[in-house]
Amino acid sequence: SMTKKMVALCACPMGLAHTFMAAEAIEVEAKNRGYEYKVETQGSDGVQNKLSRNDIEEADFIIHAIAVTPLEMERFDGKEVYEVGLQEIIKNVSGVFDEIEADLNN
């Protein structure tokens, strides 16, 4: 299929709010741009919506919006990952996607 796929991992040690604000921002932006998407969160309630190796393999790009080293980082070995601060995602998710798409289309 020609549908673009993206996945993201949001991880913050400071409880839930930032993790979920970032995850929601990514999901809304991905949907608006016509991506298939899956966003894993790692917060004080553990891991939600966990990305499989298959999810990661099939993704056109991967965002890590993290304020802490996530669990099971080895899943991403050999993949290009865009690391972005949680605050940057929350404040300017469309700018983040613009930069990634420009980079990919280079």
How should each PLM-predicted stretch be described?
Residues 66-71:
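Short, polar loop motifs at secondary-structure junctions
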Residues 22-27, 80-81, 99:
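Short, solvent-exposed amphipathic alpha-helical segments in soluble enzyme
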Residues 59, 78-79:
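Short, well-ordered alpha-helix to beta-strand connector turns
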Residues 7, 81-106:
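Ser/Thr/Gly-rich flexible loops in soluble cytosolic domains mediating phosphotransfer, phosphorylation
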Residues 32-59:
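N-terminal beta-loop-helix "entrance" segment that forms/cooperates
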Residues 9-30:
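Glycine-rich phosphate/diphosphate-binding loop of Rossmann-like nucleotide-binding domains
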